[in-house]
Amino acid sequence: MSGTRASNDRSSHPGGHKRPRYDVGNKVTVVLGAQWGDEGKGKVVDLLATDSDIICRCQGGNNAGHTVVVEGKEYDFHLFPSGIINPKAISFIGNGVVIHLPGLFEEADKNEKKGLKDWEKRLIISDRAHIVCDFHQAVDGLQEVQRQAQEGKNIGTTKKGIGPTYSSKASRTGLRICDLLSDFDEFSARFKNLAHQHQSMFSNLEVDIDGQLKKLKMYAEKIRPMVRDGVYFMYEALHGSPKKILVEGANAALLDIDFGTYPFVTSSNCTVGGVCTGLGIPPQNIGDVYGVVKTYSTRVGIGAFPTEQINEIGNLLQTRGHEWGVTTGRKRRCGWLDLVILRYAHMINGFTALALTKLDILDVLDEIKVGVAYRLNGKRIPYFPANQEILQKVEVEYEAMPGWKCDTTGARKWEDLPTRAQNYIRFVENHIGVPVKWVGVGKSRESMIELF
């Protein structure tokens, strides 16, 4: 057939009108952890949240722990977006988040005592988010005991019911917020089935079905005014008036269910893909993606950790950095910064800039090492091994740099940092090929030095 069919003419429309150009709309700014969590994401989010209109959580549950210091007060957030502190912004819990309702209100109470006000007027919850039941939390603990007995090791779960809830979701037996708010008899029947299903797997699991349902009915009325159709809410946010929208990632790249150090991972996607699926937004609405990385590495629980320092260096980092988990209170394992991991996290997330936190913890060191490559059987490997046994065997190639041996906690701009600290930062930038936008030298908002 010769010629071009009119229907293929991209510029015309039936009737000869021009096709409307698709407007992408507002873009979201994303903050993600680039290691095993505890990088200081809350602090970066807090900086950006001060002039954001909407702050979103897209995955995870109250297994995350974000600490934010405002006017000398320390707030701890687990389920809430840490932007809930901003009285001018809306906080949104997306469909990818799993919600333990008692945990949500407990967290609200604790932070209200510290000065958080009117949070219920600024919180919106997606109707498609899944519910963490009390028995999911009990099962989480029982599974950990079972793993310990069978394999002699455990995953190091927070016992917040996150894994079992995502399991229910994937096996299509989960309960969502929209189910809780519609026909309660239908919800109760499904709740009972789900509880019995878990009891058939764990003979010693006790579930107070009536008691839990009574509690859930009470929470249903409390959250009803906050629940919206999340897809429409996000679409309106993206395509309405210009808005600054911030997405706060929980957990981190190396804890991602697909890309993390499996099986010692969490049960959701904590990389950039989780933003689209956890909020119901298209990829073209992703704007800047900021990776948050500590100037050294930490990990909670077991699993391979190539740059771990089980020596005085590790102890010094643990003590100086106050490395205890916000959610679990467990001591964190410590080691040198691993640029193989950071490069891998960048490959998946496409970071547009980095936030380098806790630089001040390195102030006292004579020499600072950075992992730059892995060797396996004496040969350099150009990838990050997926298999845990192989990752356990890699030897790390280090680059050593002289320490700056002076206090950086008073630095407020780039010029205030000692030359050797500047060199360390530039080394990280050049190795990864991503600029460092912030450098953290202390706990407060003011101690995040903005470089551009």
From Swiss-Prot:
Single GO term (MF): GTP binding
Organism: Xenopus tropicalis (Western clawed frog)
Binding annotation for substrate: 38, 326-332
Family: Belongs to the adenylosuccinate synthetase family.
Pathway recorded for this protein: Purine metabolism; AMP biosynthesis via de novo pathway; AMP from IMP: step 1/2
Protein name: Adenylosuccinate synthetase isozyme 1
Domain of life according to the entry: Eukaryota
Catalytic activity: IMP + L-aspartate + GTP = N(6)-(1,2-dicarboxyethyl)-AMP + GDP + phosphate + 2 H(+)
Function of the protein: Component of the purine nucleotide cycle (PNC), which interconverts IMP and AMP to regulate the nucleotide levels in various tissues, and which contributes to glycolysis and ammoniagenesis. Catalyzes the first committed step in the biosynthesis of AMP from IMP.
Location within or outside the cell: Cytoplasm
Any Gene Ontology CC annotation: cytoplasm
Major subcellular location class: cytoplasm
GO biological process: 'de novo' AMP biosynthetic process
Cofactor comment text: Binds 1 Mg(2+) ion per subunit.
